[in-house]
Amino acid sequence: ASVAGHHLQWALAQGGDLSKLVIDQDRDAQGSKRSKHWRQIYQPPYDERLHSTRFVTERTLAFIEAAHQRQAPFLAVCSFPDPHHPLTPPGKWFDAYRPEEMLLPASRHDDLKDAPAHLRLFKDIHPKDQRNWVSPCGYGNDALLAEAIAATYGMIGMIDEGVGEILARIESLGLSEDTIIVFTSDHGDMMGEHGLFLKGFMHYRGTLQVPLLIRVPGHAAGRTQALASTIDLGPTLMAACGIKAYDG
């Protein structure tokens, strides 16, 4: 996607080409690979080292290094924009996963006859009005859905690489036994389930369930099926740090 804000300033400082970084959805960029099915699946025209995932990774690494040098406690919120539409994994990540090898959800051709009324109504709206936003891959276009899933996996793969670098840096600085690590997300994605894509007003597991991994030094590993919410994270982490929880 088009680069802006602090990310843009950082990318320019790395030698990025402004004409490639700032283009509306990169639709006019020459030479970038793109899907013939949906305009929001394409390879950005700039080098992968200038991508937002690299920006967030490197800023997080620098922040942790600076805190370590000051011997100061730190809270680092490492928030990657991806995976998110437009589906634009850069460089090698665009071809990292083959669409023809993607497993498609069994419910992708759901006619939504048992779904809430607002979803049944939505399905009948003309594609040019709404469906292209929330369900471009639904209602029979398996080729597009496979491309979308492959591109999403590419974005996730790049994030996984960045998270690995951050964890390795924490380890190399000798901070792993004094640092609580949380991995989670703000929402999921339908990824073609029930013929829907992206997120929105669909209260299915695909959008509601997110990964939640918490590592607290000195605590044994375990799993739970108990209902939890990201709203619980603040009080939980404050308690783990011996800080009085806030009201509200």
Predicted regions and their residues:
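Catalytic core of tubulin tyrosine ligase-like
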Residues: 233
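His/Cys-centered metal/cofactor-coordination and adjacent catalytic loops
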Residues: 1
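Active-site-proximal cap/lid insertion segments
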Residues: 4-58, 63-72, 77-178, 182-230, ...
